């Protein structure tokens, strides 16, 4: 289980800032696939009509986890940086660190 803060202070490399600023952290999510991309149009054309499945469907999945990609947005200039973390099964964005009876600090 990886807990990560929703806000993080780090250096903003953008020429507008070029200083340590507060960043808002969001987990990256892949966008919706485009219906009219060249490969999708070709695939749909091939699939139409009689004949069933025309291309192999991949079943031999090798990995059990995905790498965590974070989108960090600067509070000052709104520029976005993407940051890749290691593989993990459970990932959470939290305001507070989960500790025993101690005070939560980042």
From Swiss-Prot:
One of its GO terms (biological process) is translation. GO terms for molecular function: structural constituent of ribosome. It is found in: Cytoplasm. Its main location: cytoplasm. Keywords: Cytoplasm, Ribonucleoprotein, Ribosomal protein. InterPro entries: Ribosomal_eL44, Ribosomal_LSU_eL42, Ribosomal_zn-bd. The keyword Ribosomal protein applies. Pfam families: Ribosomal_L44. The keyword Ribonucleoprotein applies. One of its GO terms (cellular component) is cytoplasm. It comes from the Eukaryota. PANTHER family: 60S RIBOSOMAL PROTEIN L36A/L44 (PTHR10369). Belongs to the eukaryotic ribosomal protein eL42 family. This is Large ribosomal subunit protein eL42. The lineage of its organism: Eukaryota, Discoba, Euglenozoa, Kinetoplastea, Metakinetoplastina.
